């Protein structure tokens, strides 16, 4: 069966050479037939037919033997046999193929068959799927209608994209969404089990999607606050923040951007160096470091002295160039306040919180070692690193001093420009110091802004408003908290009407907030600039620039640090820190804490707080 089917298969078509040979042979035969007489041709054909028509005759003995054998064999029903054959092999086409065998073989090997290739070429010229109709619909492209056709194509693409987006949104809306928030029973089980960070991260991503489109994706019976509370719990569990700090940072952004901010804080910022232009140029320094096996590139167009280090075959803080003072390791965000300060040559400038000296030495380099730079820091131990960097970088116009910055201008005043990089909570540099996640409390965001306000007022009073090009104060922090940034400069604008905020002149940065959680700030606060790790790949930073337009009162200039502290505390009590917006005080609750604190102090001294005290003791 298999061998017969194999033989019935049609062979491969003849090659071009074989076909040409057959065609020539056929033509020769026609010529030979034309030369032969017709009678002879007819006789040969008839003889051939006669020979073919004569059957082969068997002898009588053979016929008798065949008949006897047929009698001995049982009778076979051919129809049943054929049905059984079909059912066994399931080959219904065998009969049809058997009838076509002779014709196929004849077509394959008949040399007299003629192929009409002209007709095939005509058929190929008219394919089934033709683009003639589409080409007819299109207009002829020329210089006049090119713009119109291009616009039409753009509109069609926009419509298709919009339809696809609508279909996607409808599909999401129609598809039932599982409830993301766990039930109370599930939360109890989660509290007992080991935290699964993978499922926590997945849940955070899903909650952010819901919060971004709460009207459509929010589950029935669930409020937005429930989603936010669950997200904050997951942030504390996944990233390791305290609930207080997580909520404070979360409120600065939209849910999606807040997640980007938290993710960026898990990654350290790139290593950056600042070229010391007092000793070299950035191009020369880059070439030298590349020759030493350092992979680097310029930070960006906004700075002409910064280089970003990707990897190095040598310790970047111990190269001969580093020891010679050709560069200093400095965060890119620390360049920003000095660029905003824009120091000029032959000016008197004060850096109120100078250690470890990155900004001070940058100021000296921009002044080309002219004028005078006062580098002050209240912490005497930190002045050691300040002095070391000043000497290594070759700054000869710098004076190091160790004063409480609130003593200015009583100590010395009349500066052309002042840079105040105020001490802060460090919420912008969590990538460097992960301890900030758990070390900062609500108390820190009350005490630190209180100090920052006093320092900023002292800086304003220490600047000479009659300076030819100066009268500038730059306030900066490495914090992203509103209490330390917008609230402080808004306070300064209210307390010192002789200053105004001006443009920082920085090429990058986001506008500061003019309102935050119901608190309205001065409209000019938007001139200040904010920097986030997830937007510019720098540490979180805040920069504001003031211009002094009038003199301060005599009392403000002569006040000491203690007097300023007393005045600030009095103002804080009157205003409730920031007009009672960020912190409220309850006297009854405070009295309880005060009484408890007094008892604890007495117990530490070994005194029984319940015992009656003598009348002469207070």
UniProtKB/Swiss-Prot annotation:
GO molecular function: RNA binding; rRNA (cytosine-C5-)-methyltransferase activity
Skewed-composition ranges (Acidic residues): 64-79, 90-123
Modified residues (Phosphoserine): 580
Bias-annotated ranges (Basic and acidic residues): 80-89
Keywords assigned: Methyltransferase, Nucleus, Phosphoprotein, Ribosome biogenesis, RNA-binding, rRNA processing, S-adenosyl-L-methionine, Transferase
Catalysis performed (reactions): cytidine(2870) in 25S rRNA + S-adenosyl-L-methionine = 5-methylcytidine(2870) in 25S rRNA + S-adenosyl-L-homocysteine + H(+)
Basic residues: bias regions: 48-59
Residues the entry annotates as binding S-adenosyl-L-methionine: 353-359, 377, 404, 421
SS bond list: none
Predominant subcellular localization, coarse grouping: nucleus
Cited function: S-adenosyl-L-methionine-dependent methyltransferase that specifically methylates the C(5) position of cytosine 2870 (m5C2870) in 25S rRNA. Required for 60S ribosomal subunit synthesis and processing.
Miscellaneous information on this protein: Present with 18700 molecules/cell in log phase SD medium.
Protein name: 25S rRNA (cytosine(2870)-C(5))-methyltransferase
Organism: Saccharomyces cerevisiae (strain ATCC 204508 / S288c)
